[in-house]
From Swiss-Prot:
This is Protein HMF1. It comes from Saccharomyces cerevisiae (strain ATCC 204508 / S288c) (Baker's yeast). The keyword Oxidoreductase does not apply. Disulfide bonds: none annotated. Signal peptide: none annotated. InterPro entries: RidA, RidA_CS, RutC-like_sf, YjgF/YER057c/UK114. CDD domains: YjgF_YER057c_UK114_family. One of its GO terms (molecular function) is deaminase activity. The lineage of its organism: Eukaryota, Fungi, Dikarya, Ascomycota, Saccharomycotina. One of its GO terms (cellular component) is mitochondrion.
Amino acid sequence: MVTTLTPVICESAPAAAASYSHAMKVNNLIFLSGQIPVTPDNKLVEGSIADKAEQVIQNIKNVLEASNSSLDRVVKVNIFLADINHFAEFNSVYAKYFNTHKPARSCVAVAALPLGVDMEMEAIAAERD
C-alpha cells in the first residue's frame, strides 16, 4: 500500500499561528492540529468557557468538513485545559456534539497554551467513504 500524505488548509478556520497545516491526511485518516477559541477571522473569543468551547468545536467541525469528514467520524480527541476546574463546563458543551458517538478521549490540564487561551482541542478522524 502506498502511503499518501495530504495537507489540509481550511478557509473557514483561523489561520495557522505557526508553521503547520490545519490537518494532515494519511490515507483515510485525518490528524487535526489543535484548535483554540479563535474565530475564522482570527479574533480571540471572550466570555465563558462554554462560549470558547463552542468556537473550538466549530473550528474542529470546519476543518473536518474541509477534509471530507465530520464530527461523527472522529475516533480520538485530545483536550488541553489551562485550568482543570473548567472540566465540567467544557464537558457540558462537548456532550452536545458527542452524545451518541463517543470517540476515545483524553483531557489534561496544562500550565499554559498559545496566545494565553484557556483550552485547545485536537482530533483524529476517519475520512468519509
